[in-house]
């Protein structure tokens, strides 16, 4: 009887973790966008006016719970919580709930960035949060939850990243480290996450997951409610979980400890794709991209070119400030069938602490758009760049097809097909790509969705004529604005 009970328990745990890898996308949609620091009302409008019509699958939103108010309002104050009240500079609970429903109604799922590891770091005296709650972080006193000193690990600093105890029980950059082995501490985030599920979210990005023991997270995840069927989710659907675990391949706390609980952020993807498109690694080697590079299995990997943290760091990671390479890398990311894809939507920054666009009263301002739909008032909105949203459409069009017809010039010019539905070519050399290449597409003329759009049967950019054998003449000049060309069956002239 004991063996039977144990078997049933293990099967249930396995099925729950497997379910937590499902992002619950509509139809053939399969790209998430991180609308970093956007207001809830603006996200609702963006779902209805742009993301839904353009085929985006979901939005990762900034933390929703009350945070400390820091001088100058740097972006990272959102990662210093003092309660679980749903009031931030992005809006209140009513506005959040309205946004979730409106986005779900147009097939765009919402994933919340959640902070389970810690509360706010030290603050001189009494801190007041975005909902008006008072706390004394220096005393580990957070009455808005409530948490007190006994709910936290003893104060210590992480000085050795190869020491598991320090990584998981000391304070990450001074943030007060919660003791998730405590039943009381576990109960509060479970209540918080369940409330968000009730409001209709599809899942969670778990910040600083590697700083929490995997067994504690497993308990929290398995205790959560199923998704809300009133928002279009099937019965018994589990929240999609993706966890921030920075693992460069030599970490004491490994991504492998978390991959069965949900997806894991594959930071090596970001670093290596940046290396390649910065010219530090030949593109020809990308033929084996994915697990061939030591990355996680595709269904367990949350993939990205950059995120809100590493786009601010020096190094190989690409960001909007290198637009040609960034667009090429993003095109490859969305065209190659590996991982659960997320694209970044940033605001302009000059230094690490730059706040989101705000007015004189330090209120976040809404994005404004020019006649082409691009953002103009401090918001970068990479997701509105044609070269990126067009690749979201490409990814939708070629879903469930494999890589075929790989070609390269032995260096930094590559092309490949996605079944007989799509074709991508990239030129990262300092000379032109001019070649008859196998596109694998049915005979006809196709619009290059990178350089233009198919409007009323006409292409506003380059077009490629494919012959009866699937071949077409591909030209990407070394000085072309984008360095990439993309064709697919939904853009046939």
Curated annotation (Swiss-Prot):
Q: Where primarily located?
A: secreted
Enzyme Commission number, as recorded: 3.2.1.1
Return the annotated site residues (Transition state stabilizer). Answer: 309
* Binding, chloride: 205, 307, 342
Q: Does the keyword Metal-binding apply?
A: yes
Which residues are connected by disulfide bridges in this protein? 47-103, 156-170, 375-381, 417-440, 447-459
Q: Which UniProt keywords apply?
A: Calcium, Carbohydrate metabolism, Chloride, Disulfide bond, Glycosidase, Hydrolase, Metal-binding, Pyrrolidone carboxylic acid, Secreted, Signal
Gene3D superfamilies in the record, alphabetically? Answer: Glycosidases, Golgi alpha-mannosidase II
One GO biological process term: carbohydrate metabolic process
Which residues of this protein are catalytic?
207 (nucleophile), 244 (proton donor)
Recorded hits in InterPro entries, A to Z, give: A-amylase/branching_C (IPR006048), A-amylase_C (IPR031319), Alpha_amylase (IPR006046), Glyco_hydro_13_cat_dom (IPR006047), Glyco_hydro_b (IPR013780), Glycoside_hydrolase_SF (IPR017853)
Q: Tell me what reaction this enzyme catalyses.
A: Endohydrolysis of (1->4)-alpha-D-glucosidic linkages in polysaccharides containing three or more (1->4)-alpha-linked D-glucose units
Q: Which family does it belong to?
A: Belongs to the glycosyl hydrolase 13 family.
Q: What is this protein called?
A: Alpha-amylase-related protein
UniProt organism field: Drosophila yakuba
